Amino acid sequence: MVKQIVRDVFFLGQPSEPATKADIQVGKDLQDTLQANRERCVGMAANMIGVKKNIIIVNMGFIDVVMFNPVIVSKRDMYETEEGCLSLDGVRKTTRYQEIEVEYYDFNGKKQRQKLSGWTAQICQHEIDHLSGKIISPKRIANIRFDRTKKTNIGG
């Protein structure tokens, strides 16, 4: 079911709780909500749809991957960038890693481990930050538009 996007910074600033098997529907709601916002974002965290659970969805090009209880287990090649967020206005400066390795559980409860790099790694890091309540005050910049080629606006 498509859910409304939460823009309450106080709510988004609170850490999420571990997901359980009972939270499968939240993953499906994230799929539906990301699909409905496809033109504006490439990833989401459950708190963005009002659920404080450790669940994210990340667009990996041709597929959207839902991750339950994702944890970054390794990272390398730090860089600075600016990102947008569907829950916040404007863009913000942040630090990311070019390459990460993330562990998570899939819809079947099977543990997965995946190496990500570039844009996909950036999206994943952004969404995992949401789970811990990390919010950086946005810097307003006029006429910011989502552009997958410039890779500046995460959206979620």
Segments the model singles out, each with a brief description of its role:
Residues 1-156:
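Positively charged
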